[in-house]
Swiss-Prot record:
Its main location: secreted. PROSITE patterns: ANNEXIN_1, ANNEXIN_2. A pair of annexin repeats may form one binding site for calcium and phospholipid. It is found in: Secreted, Extracellular space, Extracellular matrix, Basement membrane. Calcium-regulated membrane-binding protein whose affinity for calcium is greatly enhanced by anionic phospholipids. It binds two calcium ions with high affinity. It comes from Xenopus laevis (African clawed frog). This is Annexin A2-A. GO terms for biological process: positive regulation of receptor-mediated endocytosis involved in cholesterol transport. Pfam families: Annexin. The keyword Aminoacyl-tRNA synthetase does not apply.
Length: 340
């Protein structure tokens, strides 16, 4: 029995350490002295209050980890016999509602629901499809596939196939499989050189593009390996990888390859650019802003903020302050986690 306790203790410790590593770069962390029952009761009261006490709902849901939010939803259902998502839908509206509903889904459920929304009805929101499929890790993609199957009783790949076509479809399907090699400790310089040369010979060097070769290399090799490949590529090609993509392919395929290369080179910078694009100029692309803030808040928001300030001269917090208002702004400020 003592041995079982020791093993469980070790597993718990390892789990906690991996969570700590993961959340060290996030802005939303697990709340200490967490009490799901107490939070569920406070949300119930906030919803019942005349005019709805949005502030209480925001402060609870943006200051708890995703696991804790799942516990709150469970406790809420046990207390009220109502689904927390339905209750929030009835009590909130607009962008604030979208943020809060996003926060109470598990991360795989959230990505799966965003992907489903991007493909249902007439036309496809390729931008959302590309962003999620290009930026998630093998493990995240596997979890998304499982959540998608559970939620929609169909396969993610099947929906991608029926909603896309040509080489763009091939690239999306290859990425969605989540078969990228994991990061190894050995640097294979011969393989780096070979891949760089093959990318050049399949594109800029020839008439027409061997897109299949690009897809194989860019969807199967590990991220650190590809970072070195793109660096080495410059010694073969007069253009860097992004410039080569712009010269060789067009439309959704071009957009997808560019997103992919940017994610491989520097994922926090990629998301900083997405956030900037969502807020620059007139009007706000709230869908992109909300998805990025919700999905990255526990993963790498601190890194994203750093890249944002470095590239755009002003903080992410400042941009959110300029572009949003009211309770919606407050929720995003909490997910942003402070000014730089």
């Amino acid at each position: 029995m003592a041995l079982i306790h020791e093993i469980l203790g070790k597993l718990s410790l390892e789990g906690n350490q991996s969570c700590a590593r993961q959340s060290a770069l996030g802005t939303v962390k697990a709340s200490t002295n967490f009490d799901a029952e107490k939070d569920a009761a406070a949300i119930e009261t906030a919803i019942k209050t005349k005019g709805v006490d949005e502030l209480t709902i925001i402060n609870i849901l943006t200051n708890r980890s995703n696991d804790q939010r799942q516990d709150i939803a469970f406790a809420y259902h046990r207390r009220t016999k109502k689904d927390l998502a339905s209750a929030l839908k009835g009590a909130l509206s607009g962008n604030l509602e979208t943020v809060m509903l996003g926060l109470i889904k598990t991360r795989p459920q959230y990505d799966a629901s965003e992907l489903k929304a991007s493909m249902k009805g007439l036309g496809t929101d390729e931008d959302t499809l590309i962003e999620i499929i290009c930026s998630r890790t093998n493990k995240e993609l596997l979890d998304i596939q499982n959540a998608y199957r559970e939620l929609y009783k169909t396969e993610l790949e099947k929906d991608i196939v029926s909603d896309t076509s040509g080489d763009f479809r091939k690239l999306m399907v290859a990425l969605a499989k989540g078969k990228r090699q994991e990061e190894g400790s050995v640097v294979d310089y011969e393989k780096i050189d070979q891949d760089a040369r093959e990318l050049y010979e399949a594109g800029v060097k020839r008439k027409g593009t061997d897109v299949g070769k690009w897809i194989t290399i860019m969807t199967e090799r590990s991220t650190p390996h590809l970072q070195k490949v793109f660096e080495r590529y410059k010694s073969y090609s007069p253009y860097d990888m992004e410039e080569s993509i712009k010269k060789e392919v067009k439309g959704d395929l071009e957009n997808a390859f560019l997103n992919l290369v940017q994610c491989i080179q520097n994922k926090p910078l990629y998301f900083a650019d997405r956030l900037y694009e969502s807020m620059k100029g007139r009007g706000t692309k709230d869908k992109i802003l909300i998805r990025t803030m919700v999905s990255r808040s526990e993963l790498d928001m601190l890194k994203i903020r750093k890249e944002f300030k470095k590239k755009y001269g002003k903080s992410l917090h400042y941009f959110i302050g300029q572009d949003t208002k009211g309770d919606y702004q407050r929720a995003l400020f909490n997910l942003c986690g402070g000014d730089d």
